Amino acid sequence: GEGINGTIAGVYESIIKFESHLLSLGFADHNPKYSYSKIMPFFRLKVRDKKEIVTLRSKNVDPENITGKKIKPKYWNNLISDKKTILIDLRNNFEVEMGTFKNSLNPNTKSFTDFKSYLKNNLKKAKDKKIAMFCTGGIRCEKMSSYMRKKGFKDVNQLDGGILNYLEKTSQDNSLWNGECFVFDNRVSVKNELKDGTYDLCHACGYPVSQDMLKSKKYQKGISCINCYGKISESKKQSLKDRRKQISIAK
């Protein structure tokens, strides 16, 4: 298997105890990242057994033995400021639209698997170029850098610990990050220095909603946003309205 990827939230003492328990089980390459939230990021426990931590659908990867060079946040700015560096955002299009590094390429993908086609169609002549890639927490980079190395790319670099590690370790004054970073919990997004972001989440389609989008007539809290308005069936819309009522009563 590829290992375990997980996120938990709780008070400091509980997190430390849990981490100690994990280490006692003998897991290798323990690489935790910490941040703080004013709200509980998760409402329930969710455990999934998957064939791949992030789905690439390729046997041509071996992240345990071959990946790109991991670049610490303190060295990242120098790398991506080099005009010879090709900087690639590995995340999906909606994530890139929320925020990214200046001058990065947006592959316009809807899923991680799509990046293979982008690579074939757009970067096949860049195998001797200096490549720098980044993603939210570093996992997508682990797989894609391995895939690219196997495909003959010689100088592949990846942001160690991903965007979240960079935002945590880099002061806002020195940051080359623009915008916000989508996170897969109730915070929805974070900004420089991992401060809480401004995005909300459409509970009908799971799409992040900016403050400007909240002003749209197509936005109804918990029912629709500009991404899914007109695409939701009446039965689904009614069930969402019923859910909103239940949440309101529970509060």
Put a short name on every predicted segment:
Residues 1-67, 92-131, 139-251:
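Rhodanese-like catalytic fold shared by cysteine-dependent sulfurtransferases
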Residues 66-82:
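Internal catalytic-core helix/loop-beta-alpha segment
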Residues 85:
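Hydrophobic "anchor" residues on beta-strands that sit immediately upstream
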Residues 88-89:
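Structural scaffold elements adjacent to functional motifs in cytosolic proteins
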